[in-house]
């Protein structure tokens, strides 16, 4: 059963004047009625603008190339899907029967598109200031952890170097699930390292993306352990 969209609005802290905009943002193209593609287009643009503005102000000495790479570490399908999962966005999506049966509510591409569509809906309903505030809230953790070195190394490389620097075995990645149609696959990968008691799981539209997300999730977990600096 789809959870109440009013509940999601409260979770976001957005009092929508037009609740229909939020419903549209959560409606996948596989469902009947107005879908979220136009709002996604708008949300993608405002997200890029707000993150670019933030980076420009925070790193005044960084050149255009560095700023672009930093933005790419923040604005991508994997990071957006991770935030969408933190919001449990899949439980609010309106999907067609085929997408519902195939687990579309778990798919990175659908989750990230829906999150961008929500940002577009907030922009339309509340204006740029409210939309900017929401983006900075949703991205607060990755933004606060950002450094000028982030664009140089991907999560798998950083995790591998962390293990090597401590003389520990390298991370182990295991494919635990693969589903979806041939043109729209969904992968789940488990990452295990000696520093963590429990493994971390990553998801993505390819095994490579799932491994990168699993590594990033593991780095986030280790960064919460005060004796490790990731």
Swiss-Prot record:
EC category name: hydrolase
Example of a GO biological process term: tRNA processing
Primary location: cytoplasm
SMART domains (alphabetical): DSRM, RIBOc
InterPro entries cross-referenced by the UniProt entry: dsRBD_dom, RNase_III, RNase_III_dom, RNase_III_sf
Residue span of region Disordered: 202-230
All residue ranges annotated as the RNase III domain in the record: 5-127
DRBM domain span: 154-224
Reactions catalysed, as given in the entry: Endonucleolytic cleavage to 5'-phosphomonoester
Compartment annotation: Cytoplasm
PROSITE patterns named among the record's database cross-references: DS_RBD, RNASE_3_1, RNASE_3_2
Needed co-factor(s): Mg(2+)
Positions that bind Mg(2+): 40, 113, 116
MF-aspect GO terms: double-stranded RNA binding; metal ion binding; ribonuclease III activity; rRNA binding
One Pfam family linked to the record: dsrm
Protein's UniProt keywords contain Lyase: no
UniProt KW keywords: Cytoplasm, Endonuclease, Hydrolase, Magnesium, Metal-binding, mRNA processing, Nuclease, RNA-binding, rRNA processing, rRNA-binding, tRNA processing
Domain of life: Bacteria
Similarity comment: family membership: Belongs to the ribonuclease III family.
Function recorded in the entry: Digests double-stranded RNA. Involved in the processing of primary rRNA transcript to yield the immediate precursors to the large and small rRNAs (23S and 16S). Processes some mRNAs, and tRNAs when they are encoded in the rRNA operon. Processes pre-crRNA and tracrRNA of type II CRISPR loci if present in the organism.
Assembly, per entry: Homodimer.
Protein name: Ribonuclease 3
Organism for this UniProt entry: Methylococcus capsulatus (strain ATCC 33009 / NCIMB 11132 / Bath)
């Amino acid at each position: 059963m789809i959870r109440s969209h009013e509940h999601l609005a409260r979770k976001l802290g957005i009092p929508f004047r037009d609740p229909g905009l939020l419903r549209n943002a959560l409606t996948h193209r596989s469902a009947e009625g107005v879908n979220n593609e136009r709002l996604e287009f708008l949300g993608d643009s405002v997200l890029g603008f707000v993150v670019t503005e933030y980076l420009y102000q925070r790193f005044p000495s960084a050149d255009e190339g560095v700023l672009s790479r930093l933005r790419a570490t923040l604005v991508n399908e994997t990071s957006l899907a991770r935030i969408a999962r933190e919001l449990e966005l899949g439980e609010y999506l309106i999907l067609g029967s085929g997408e519902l049966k195939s687990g579309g509510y778990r798919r990175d591409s659908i989750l990230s598109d829906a999150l961008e569509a929500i940002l577009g809906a907030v922009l339309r309903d509340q204006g740029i200031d409210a939309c900017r505030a929401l983006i900075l809230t949703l991205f607060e953790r990755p933004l606060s952890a950002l450094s000028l070195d982030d664009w140089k190394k991907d999560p798998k490389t950083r995790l591998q170097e962390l293990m090597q620097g401590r003389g520990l075995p390298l991370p182990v990645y295991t494919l635990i699930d693969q589903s979806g149609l041939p043109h729209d696959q969904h992968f789940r990968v488990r990452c295990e390292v000696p520093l963590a008691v429990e493994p971390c799981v990553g998801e993505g539209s390819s095994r490579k993306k799932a491994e990168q997300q699993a590594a990033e999730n593991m780095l986030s977990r280790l960064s919460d352990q005060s004796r490790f600096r990731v």
